[in-house]
Amino acid sequence: MYAILLDRNKQYKVTCGKIIRLEKIKMNIGEKIIFKKIIFLSKDEKSFIGKPILSDVYIEGLISKHGREKKIKIIKFHRRKHYKKTQGHRQYYTDVKIKQIIY
């Protein structure tokens, strides 16, 4: 059984026990989180498609870790002008462990 959830305009395919990496959520480690925007559910041979979401399905998860991604470098460059600008960025993330899919 798996489901596709919608979180801040991004879709994630989840199963029970899977750890997904989301953008930063301002909650403490160990807190329970409930996702209510489920757009697809597949159970055994049956599939349920939301129009736009499934109202009676939700997913329970547990905040397991906060962190920052690996640093990426952004470089702007203009040829023959002695212009070069570098910048770095590290995105914050939250790991969520999926406990159960309730339907």
UniProtKB/Swiss-Prot annotation:
The yes or no answer to whether the keyword Ribonucleoprotein is present is yes
> In the UniProt record, which is one GO cellular component term?
ribosome
Provide one Gene Ontology biological process annotation.
translation
Does the record carry Ribosomal protein as a key word?
yes
The family database entries (Pfam families) matched by this protein are listed as: Ribosomal_L21p
Give the function comment from the record.
This protein binds to 23S rRNA in the presence of protein L20.
Task: Name the PANTHER family for this protein.
Answer: 50S RIBOSOMAL PROTEIN L21, LARGE RIBOSOMAL SUBUNIT PROTEIN BL21M
Could you identify this protein by its name?
Large ribosomal subunit protein bL21
Phylogenetic lineage? Bacteria, Pseudomonadati, Pseudomonadota, Gammaproteobacteria, Enterobacterales
